[in-house]
């Protein structure tokens, strides 16, 4: 009979109940039904969060618990670790920009903050700069760019990782500028780069475009510097 009950629960899409109904103590009808419904709601919320994490596009999952905070991480005046990790920057649509050389933990920190946002039910998208640029070119060539940009409007936080690793094609640079401009005061960005702003023209290939992009970015941004010594990867 128990197996039949579980089968029927799954047939009517009550997987949470099917997993845990045997462990629910019966005291009275209202209490029992309430506990069963809680099981189902918890299961559905967990499944929703898992789907959001999968569709966010993270390359590797990293958590804040795994990140090592140290004196080599320089936060700007007025920004605290808690303000970032508690996601307070999302409410005023502020940006976080992590700058530093390779191996300083920029991508880890960006990923971990974005993952926490996902786990709190916020819609997130993670891209590398080169990957997003190529995707924008592809969508533009296929005539589906507007649909893609429309889908980004539903996202609360966009991560653009590794600006500076690969120079961008002129058309790709202009499209990436459009994405960043569209985010201005509408959603938050987390950007990582191994280059100072003064070197971004080597990525975007146009001084005027670069100047406009940087000006737009830094208006509502917290710029965090991550140095190479000590490196979060080297501390155990």
Model-derived features: where do they sit?
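Loop/turn-to-beta-strand initiation segments
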Residues: 123, 154-157, 186-190
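Interdomain "pre-motor" coupling segment immediately N-terminal to P-loop NTPase/helicase cores
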Residues: 14-58
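Phosphate-binding P-loop
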Residues: 86-93
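N-terminal pre-Walker A segment at the start of P-loop NTPase domains
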Residues: 67-84
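Single conserved hydrophobic/aromatic residue that forms the stacking wall/gate
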Residues: 227-236
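Short glycine-rich substrate-engagement loop in P-loop NTPases that contacts/grips substrate
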Residues: 126-152
């Amino acid at each position: 009979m128990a197996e039949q009950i579980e089968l029927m629960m799954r047939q009517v899409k009550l997987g949470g109940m099917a997993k845990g109904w045997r462990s629910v103590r019966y005291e009275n009808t209202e209490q029992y039904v309430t506990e069963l419904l809680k099981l189902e709601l918890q299961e559905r919320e967990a499944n929703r969060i898992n789907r959001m994490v999968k569709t966010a596009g993270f390359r590797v999952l990293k958590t804040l618990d795994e990140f090592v905070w140290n004196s080599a991480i320089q936060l700007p005046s007025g920004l605290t670790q808690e303000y970032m990790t508690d996601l307070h920057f999302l409410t005023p649509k502020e940006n976080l920009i992590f700058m530093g050389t390779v191996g300083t933990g920029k991508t880890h920190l960006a990923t971990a903050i974005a993952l926490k946002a996902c786990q709190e039910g916020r819609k997130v998208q993670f891209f590398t700069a080169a990957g997003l640029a190529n995707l924008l070119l592809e969508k533009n060539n296929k005539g589906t760019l507007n649909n893609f940009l429309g889908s980004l409007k539903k996202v609360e936080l966009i991560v653009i990782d590794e600006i500076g690793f690969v120079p961008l094609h002129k058309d790709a640079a202009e499209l990436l500028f459009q994405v960043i401009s569209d985010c201005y005061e509408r959603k938050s960005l987390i950007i990582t780069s191994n280059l100072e702003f003064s070197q971004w023209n080597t990525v975007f290939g146009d001084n005027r475009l670069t100047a406009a992009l940087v000006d737009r970015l830094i208006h509502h941004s917290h710029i965090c510097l991550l140095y190479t010594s000590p490196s979060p990867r080297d501390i155990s």
